[in-house]
């Protein structure tokens, strides 16, 4: 694995390049929301690689609320993200655990919705998401966390598609923070394509 770029800006630029090359596609697609789009972003090729996880962990950790004790997100897209951020926090000597929110309660054992070390009721949790379109996945995670007694006021995403997700999250009293907008990733993909 190559070492991280020396500055935060270089790290951010490298992450944008990785997303543009490995996560972004142009064509005709049906999104998880059911919407049709000419742009598709699948962050998993980046978020499931060691070097991508390292970049994402550092980039996302910067936007986790200072008093948050956990990061959480809906399985599957958020699974590597919460782990990467918890690891980056540990390396920065910050205690921050990871929780995975199931799409439905476990059908056996404890019938749990949440996996991971559960903090006490009332604890602040920051929700992580790979891509926000309508905000539906984030809202499902937030609903489960709030029903369990946790304080959730912020969602941090890698890419905001700017298709109503921020407005839906704001309506649920959530702040959306994004590393990149879809147009930034698409533009970088075009730039990289013309360079080759």
From Swiss-Prot:
EC code(s) of this entry: 2.4.2.10
Annotated residues for binding of 5-phospho-alpha-D-ribose 1-diphosphate: 102-103, 106, 108, 129-137
Catalytic activity: orotidine 5'-phosphate + diphosphate = orotate + 5-phospho-alpha-D-ribose 1-diphosphate
Keyword Translocase: no
Chain sites annotated for binding orotate: 133, 161
GO terms (BP aspect): 'de novo' UMP biosynthetic process; pyrimidine nucleobase biosynthetic process
Record-linked InterPro entries: OPRT, Or_phspho_trans_dom, PRibTrfase_dom, PRTase-like
PANTHER family per record: OROTATE PHOSPHORIBOSYLTRANSFERASE, URIDINE 5'-MONOPHOSPHATE SYNTHASE
Function noted in UniProt: Catalyzes the transfer of a ribosyl phosphate group from 5-phosphoribose 1-diphosphate to orotate, leading to the formation of orotidine monophosphate (OMP).
NCBIfam families: pyrE (TIGR00336)
UniProt family annotation: Belongs to the purine/pyrimidine phosphoribosyltransferase family. PyrE subfamily.
HAMAP family: PyrE
Protein name, as recorded: Orotate phosphoribosyltransferase
